């Protein structure tokens, strides 16, 4: 999560609560840091000097802030995707309730997968890293299947819309085909412009999160130097790429291929 050379490496579950931040495995605390900077490792209180306590306080505050930012970014990205798909459905004939229902179901499946990773309850956030990194890769497979299902439904709808356009109205096949192509080109250009504007905004937010994660990584390394046992729970790695969504252009190329 979320940008080039900027990622949170979740193997366990991060819990952002009102009073503290916790890293859990099988619902058992690996570490816990409260708002004052007090650290517990596997349930045992760790005494630290004033400097380390302040560093821990800054760390939990940074994790809290960035987790909320990432969750907001993911939610807005999902909304953008849903909006784009809805516009495609409308362009292909919004009077088709069966198509709308099937696409809504596919988008709903994607949202359900995301909701199993990020759980919000009141003001608390739980990021289930254990579900992302499960041994059999089941989550990744199911997520990819849901994406493929959405694209298959839209591709099928496009073919049906094309066939309907060819069978209606006057004129020969070539004329109808050209008119349909012009209609789809205009729609595609308009949609691309709208999604690019929104996508650029999301990317800018991702850049900001990435910058702040790099700063937080420095704090994390300071903690690991001061409390060596924390090295086992490294959350931030600025040397690796995070999970990235496909760019709009790539999706269009796949659709045109």
Region spans (language model):
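Charged/polar interaction segments and conserved charged motifs
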Residues: 1-32, 166, 170-173, 177, ...
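Residue-level signal for secondary-structure boundary elements
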Residues: 68-71, 78, 82, 115-118, ...
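Extended amphipathic alpha-helical interaction segments
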Residues: 104-207
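N-terminal Sec/ER secretory leader and immediately downstream segment
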Residues: 1-110
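Short, surface-exposed, charge-dense and proline/glycine-enriched linear segments
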Residues: 82, 97-121, 155-158, 224-231, ...
């Amino acid at each position: 999560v979320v940008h080039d050379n900027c990622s949170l490496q979740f193997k366990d579950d991060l819990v952002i609560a009102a009073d503290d931040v916790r890293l859990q495995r099988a619902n058992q605390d690996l570490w816990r840091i409260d708002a004052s900077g007090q650290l517990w490792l596997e349930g045992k209180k760790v005494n630290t000097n004033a400097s380390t306590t302040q560093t821990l306080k800054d760390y939990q505050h940074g994790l809290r802030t960035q987790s909320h930012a990432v969750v907001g970014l993911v939610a807005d990205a999902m909304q953008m995707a849903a909006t784009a798909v809805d516009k495609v459905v409308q362009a292909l004939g919004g009077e088709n309730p069966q198509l709308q229902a099937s696409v809504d179901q596919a988008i709903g499946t994607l949202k359900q997968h995301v909701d199993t990773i990020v759980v919000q309850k009141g003001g608390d956030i739980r990021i289930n890293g254990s579900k992302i990194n499960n041994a059999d890769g089941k989550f990744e497979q199911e997520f990819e299947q849901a994406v493929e299902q959405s694209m298959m439904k839209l591709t099928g709808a496009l073919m049906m819309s094309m066939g309907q356009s060819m069978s209606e109205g006057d004129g020969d096949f070539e004329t109808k085909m050209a008119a349909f192509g012009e209609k789809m080109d205009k729609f595609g250009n308009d949609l691309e412009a709208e999604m690019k504007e929104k996508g650029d905004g999301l990317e800018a937010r991702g850049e900001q999160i990435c910058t702040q994660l790099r700063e937080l990584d420095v704090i994390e390394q300071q903690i690991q130097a001061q409390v060596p046992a924390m090295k086992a729970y490294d959350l931030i790695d600025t040397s690796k790429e995070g999970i990235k969504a496909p760019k709009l252009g790539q999706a269009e190329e796949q659709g045109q291929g």
